[in-house]
Curated annotation (Swiss-Prot):
LRR repeats lie at residues 584-609, 610-632, 634-655, 700-725, 726-751, 847-871. Changing residue 370 to V: Loss of victorin sensitivity. Changing residue 470 to E/R: Loss of victorin sensitivity. This is Disease susceptibility protein LOV1. The lineage of its organism: Eukaryota, Viridiplantae, Streptophyta, Embryophyta, Tracheophyta. Residues 22-60 form a coiled coil. GO terms for molecular function: ADP binding; ATP binding. It comes from Arabidopsis thaliana (Mouse-ear cress). Induction: Repressed by silencing mediated by polycomb group (PcG) protein complex containing EMF1 and EMF2. Confers susceptibility to the fungus Cochliobolus victoriae by conditioning victorin-dependent (victorin is a toxin synthesized by C.victoriae) induction of defense-associated proteins. Keywords: ATP-binding, Coiled coil, Leucine-rich repeat, Nucleotide-binding, Plant defense, Repeat.
């Protein structure tokens, strides 16, 4: 039995009481009484959660428990925080302080008694409904046990897009042919119901060898139901012209003209994914010339959208899978596993499992998404009884499905089962994804910090960090096909995750059912129903516009998280709304990224939010921070990555619980920050020797990630300070001195024994010897280094390097050589803006695992002769080089690239 969301809250409260037992000394009797009742409550909740769909009264009891647990947490944490602040004031006015202390303790004891009484009443009510105590709790495998099992067998289910395709090979060929060879059409459309595989099919066409060779540039834009014309145009421009920098502030009419002209002059493929209505196309179409080299691949649930965009368009309607194809796909996910070497092996299929599986996939209605989710669920079950339990849960939907609605209900039942089967911590993680707008690329680090701020994930004594644990959670959700993860081999860690819109509907439905979250949009600001629900919700997600002003008094004063998602830089908090901070005293998570504050001042009332664990002001319009920030002593995450110059008072030193701190890039010249007390920091971004002392780093021994700007001649001190950071894995080092001073990079990073990712933007005429670097260094990014000697002979001997980027004058010599046997693990290489480079020799046997190569604006470079030796190469991107005529079919050097599946030319005709 999978544990419920409410049970997780009770478990967290239990842990809080245990963790703070010493500080609650003196009122132990009341605390012990509360813990006893919590123990009884936990045993009842396992049965109550299983019966919540059968009884409204049970659901009401669960909601009561949720509110009681939240109230108890608020009471306990407020008491502990007030006690800490009282002690902090010293011995002045001792008698008065003691009197207040005793009053607070008596009130706290009374409050705890009240909470205990409420829990007793709930327990009595539950028992009257026949809810049973389940003490054993051994009926479900914990996430930790599941992860241990997975680590032992190292299984990876075949859930990539490529392996999910069943019976569509001919369709891919036909669609690719129309895009490349049919000059009478501009638009190729793929239509079909949600979850049927339109995007998966489009992605296969997009990456088809013939398509990649034919077009000069590519853009992929998710449109969805909520979009702005400007945002779609911006995304198209950014993908077709990635080198042209930030265009977020470009006038819409100027952008329209530039994009129109661009599409007139080259062969570009634009994918518009999930266009809902014909009117949506009418809003977007102004940037597309009537007939030029551009083509469009469009996906929609509405078959008429493609015809409306181009009456001559080629339309392809996706079909549902047959029962046989559905089982074949499910089998792939459940029974085909890869070992550590990547070898695919089949697991023997039990006859009873196969019989049940073939019946269960009929509930998926032939939708690949539903089949994949069912497969992900069944892949966690290894015995016939476990499969039987899933079968019984789906059972009522196996018969009598005669209409489309019946089919959809059975499909949503399958998707919902994947949620119900999750361990309680993963339920919270999954529900948290409901905060994000449709098709939003969810930055996983941001997600992990949200979860940590709410106590959903925590670090462990064994050295497991919040990020480590968060990645385990996401891997589990991805294994179940409930999310997709974008993991770029250029980088150490996962960057983004996403949900399919049908899975998101399940997520939103469950979040509403659990009263987990309310989403507030400008378009619904006047909705009475929305206002009523806002008054109950503890979490609030605001999507776009100047919506915070519209919330008014409808927000529940006990809201714990308030997240704002901007679609454009248009949001502004006026002074009249600033009291809203005071009206939300229990906030733990506050994200005001890209918010504009009138007058550039963050209201001092921010200091009243003493429970805050997460505060993001990333790209907010702020010029002055108040000293009241010093009150936020429980902060774990603070992002001050503002736009422009800002005044920062020296109060950050008081936030000693911080795990993540991003400082502003530019502060007033007189700013001096003392940061040595921030001993729990794991990530410190934008640290500058101009505003703080390098010596402060000596105390931050838990740092795993550091970005640092050198503004003075402090390399010796810096080297010794970095040497103390024995846990450092990621280092970004930038030189801002004028004039630039030559460094010996190896001296700086010599003692960083766990370093895996290194970015250097320092003047360094010669690259250090390889023995100065940790052998497990995986990723290196060098720019503006002005290296005069070829760094490749040293870099290629770093045996674990997976990605190398040399850009913007990293190397100023004329010749580079990649020798035989060099770079044995390298997957990605980028050479960009190396203006003096003329010759690059690639010997046979070099870079045997290279998958992607980008050569950008190296104007003097001759076409490398050994590219054809790199047989592993899958993607070659050439930007701003005059090689296209030689490398296209029929060109004199085509043989060098003919076996590379994806060759892309960008701005190569100038």
């Amino acid at each position: 039995m999978a544990e419920g969301v409410v049970l997780f809250g009770v478990h967290k409260l239990w842990e809080l009481l245990n963790r703070e037992s010493a500080r609650l000394n003196g009122i132990g009797e009341q605390v012990d009484g509360l813990k006893r009742q919590l123990g009884r409550l936990q045993s009842l909740l396992k049965d109550a959660d299983a019966k919540k769909h059968e009884s409204e009264r049970v659901r009401n009891f669960l909601e009561d428990v949720r509110d009681i647990v939240y109230d108890a947490e608020d009471i306990i944490e407020s008491f502990l925080l007030n006690e800490f602040r009282t002690k902090e004031k010293g011995i002045k006015k001792h008698a008065r302080r003691l009197a207040c202390f005793l009053v607070d303790r008596r009130k706290f004891a009374s409050d705890i008694k009240g909470i205990t009484k409420k829990i007793s009443e709930v327990i009595g009510g539950m028992k009257s409904l026949g809810i049973q105590e389940i003490i054993d709790g051994a009926s479900s495998m914990s996430l930790q046990e599941r992860q241990r099992e997975q680590k032992e067998i190292r299984q990876t289910f075949a859930n990539s897009s490529e392996s999910d395709l069943v019976g569509v090979e001919q369709s891919v060929e036909a669609l690719a042919g129309h895009l490349v060879e049919n000059d009478n059409i501009q638009v190729v459309s793929i239509s079909g119901m949600g979850g049927i595989g339109k995007t998966t099919l489009a992605r296969q066409v997009f990456h088809h060898d013939m398509v990649q060779r034919h077009f000069d540039g590519f853009a992929w834009v998710f449109v969805s139901q909520q979009f702005t014309q400007k945002h779609v145009w911006q995304r198209i421009w950014q993908e077709l012209q990635p080198q042209n920098g930030d265009i977020s502030h470009m006038d819409e009419h100027i952008l329209q003209g530039k994009l129109f002209k661009l599409l007139e002059t080259g062969r570009y493929l634009v994918v518009l994914d999930d266009v809902w209505k014909e009117e949506d196309w009418d809003r977007i179409k102004a940037v597309f010339p009537r007939k030029r080299g551009w083509k469009m691949l469009l996906t929609s649930r509405n078959e008429g959208v493609g015809i409306h965009a181009d009456p001559k368009s080629f339309g392809f309607k996706t079909r549902i899978l047959t029962p046989e194809e559905s089982w074949k796909l499910c089998e792939k996910i459940v029974f085909h596993r890869r070992d550590e070497t990547g070898t695919l092996s089949e697991v023997r299929v039990d006859e009873d499992m196969e019989a049940m599986g073939k019946e269960m996939v009929t509930c998926c209605g032939g939708l690949p998404l539903a089949v994949k989710v069912l497969g992900g669920l069944l892949a966690t079950k290894h015995t016939v009884p476990e499969w039987k339990r899933v079968y019984d849960n789906i059972g009522p939907h196996l018969a009598g499905r005669s209409s489309l609605d019946d089919n959809l209900n059975s499909i949503y039942r399958v998707l919902s089962l994947s949620y119900e089967d999750l361990p309680m911590c993963l339920k919270h993680c999954f529900l948290y994804l409901a905060h994000f707008p449709e098709y939003y690329e969810i930055h996983v680090k941001r997600l992990f910090n949200y979860l940590a701020a709410e106590g959903i994930i925590t670090s462990s004594d064994d050295g497991t960090t919040i990020q480590d644990k968060g990645e385990d959670y996401l891997e589990e959700l991805a294994r179940r096909n409930m999310i997709t993860i974008d993991k770029n081999y250029m980088f150490l860690r996962k960057k983004h995750c996403q949900m399919h819109d049908m899975m998101r509907e399940v997520c939103l439905s469950k979040a509403k059912e659990e009263n987990f979250l309310e989403i507030f949009k400008v378009s619904t600001a006047t909705s009475a129903i929305n206002a009523r629900s806002l008054s109950k919700s503890r979490r609030l997600s605001v999507h776009g516009g100047n919506a915070l002003q519209s919330l008014g008094q409808t927000i529940n004063k006990k809201v714990r998280s308030l997240l704002y998602f901007a679609f454009e830089d248009e949001f502004c908090i006026l002074e009249s709304t600033t009291p809203c901070f005071r009206s939300l005293p229990l906030l733990r998570v506050l994200d005001l990224s890209r918010v504009k504050f009138e007058g550039g001042k963050l209201p001092s009332s921010i200091g009243d939010l003493i429970h805050l664990r997460f505060l993001s002001l990333h790209r907010a319009w702020i010029s002055h921070l108040p000293s009241s920030l010093r009150n936020l002593k429980l902060l774990l995450y603070l992002n001050l990555g503002f736009n422009g110059m800002v005044h920062v008072p020296n109060v950050l030193k008081e936030m000693q619980e911080l795990r993540y701190l991003q400082l502003p890039m530019s502060m007033h010249d007189k700013t001096k920050l003392e940061l040595s007390d921030l001993v729990n920091l794991e990530s410190l971004m934008n640290f500058s020797t101009k505003y703080a002392s390098v010596m402060d780093l000596l105390h931050m021994t838990k740092l795993r990630e550091l970005s640092l700007f050198i503004t003075d001649g402090s390399s010796d001190t810096l080297s010794s300070s970095l040497g103390q950071l024995r846990s450092l894995e990621v280092l970004h080092l930038y030189d801002r001195q004028e004039p630039r001073v030559a460094y010996h990079g190896g001296e700086i990073v010599l003692n960083c024994i766990h370093l895996k990712e290194l970015e250097l933007a320092i003047h360094m005429p010669r690259f250090p010897d390889q023995y100065l670097f940790h052998p497990h260094l995986s990723h290196i990014y060098l720019w503006c280094c002005s290296m005069e000697e070829d760094p490749i002979p040293i870099l290629e001997r770093l045996l674990h390097l997976k990605s190398v980027i040399l850009t913007f004058g990293a190397f100023v010599g004329r010749r580079m050589v990649c020798s035989k046997g060099g770079f044995p693990q390298l997957c990605f290489l980028k050479l960009e803006e190396l203006e003096e480079l003329e010759e690059w020799i690639v010997e046979e046997g070099s870079m045997p695992l290279l998958r992607a190569l980008t050569i950008c604006n190296c104007r003097k470079l001759k076409l490398p002769g050994g590219i054809n030796y790199i047989t592993s190469l899958k993607e070659l991107t050439i930007v701003g080089m005059k090689w296209k005529e030689k490398l296209v079919p029929g060109g004199e050097d085509y043989y060098k690239v003919q076996n590379i599946p994806n060759v892309q030319f960008i701005n190569c005709d100038e």
